[in-house]
């Protein structure tokens, strides 16, 4: 299992429509960067905005045998943060497990489709349908809160470093702050 941790754009951006979204995502030069941009620009805008949008995801499986439909199954999360003093405080975010379809056009990649697992009583049947042979692997990682928290910690530490932020702590709503 490869764990992918990615940092998104500085601001949460409201979703764009149709081909505009694809043109923005075409700026990504590899499919992981395309996923980061998609999560930051299309998914993060579904939540209350923060100063920073930070995608965190675990790759479950990849099929990159066809550059016109690279398929990445994963447990995709988006967190929106605002900085207060030395602490990044989570203002919103959520989980979006599913299957990303990424297309290569020339040297650029963009997300062409995202099949998301449904909520509520449809979660299990839709997860089984979308993840198929990778369902058990998905379940193991999706159910491991400690693994996700460790991954999120590492992603946030890299995000703070890469963006020159002064934060030394992060805090999820209702929980004590944790050191980066």
What is each model feature region?
Residues 3-6:
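C-terminal motif of bacterial Sec signal peptides marking the signal peptidase cleavage site
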Residues 10-77:
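N-terminal export/targeting and maturation segments
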Residues 25-29, 89-92, 146:
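Soluble non-cytosolic domains of exported or imported proteins
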Residues 56-121:
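Mature extracytoplasmic domains of secretory-pathway proteins
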Residues 112-180:
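Low-complexity, intrinsically disordered terminal/linker segments enriched in charged
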């Amino acid at each position: 299992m490869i764990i992918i941790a990615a940092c998104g754009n500085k601001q949460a951006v409201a979703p764009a429509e149709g081909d505009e979204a694809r043109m923005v995502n075409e700026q990504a030069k590899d499919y992981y960067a395309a996923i980061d941009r998609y999560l930051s620009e299309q998914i993060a805008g579904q939540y209350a905005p923060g100063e920073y949008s930070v995608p965190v995801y675990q790759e479950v499986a990849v099929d990159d045998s066809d550059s016109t439909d690279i398929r990445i199954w994963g447990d995709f999360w988006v967190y929106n943060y605002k900085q207060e003093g030395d602490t990044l405080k989570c203002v919103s975010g959520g989980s979006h497990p599913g299957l990303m379809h990424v297309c290569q056009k020339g040297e650029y990649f963009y997300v062409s489709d995202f099949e998301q697992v449904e909520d509520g009583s449809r979660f299990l049947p839709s997860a089984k349908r979308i993840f198929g042979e990778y369902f058990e692997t998905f379940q193991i990682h999706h159910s491991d809160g400690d693994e996700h928290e460790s991954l999120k910690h590492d992603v946030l530490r890299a995000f703070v470093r890469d963006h020159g932020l002064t934060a030394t702590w992060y805090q999820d709503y209702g929980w004590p702050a944790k050191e980066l």
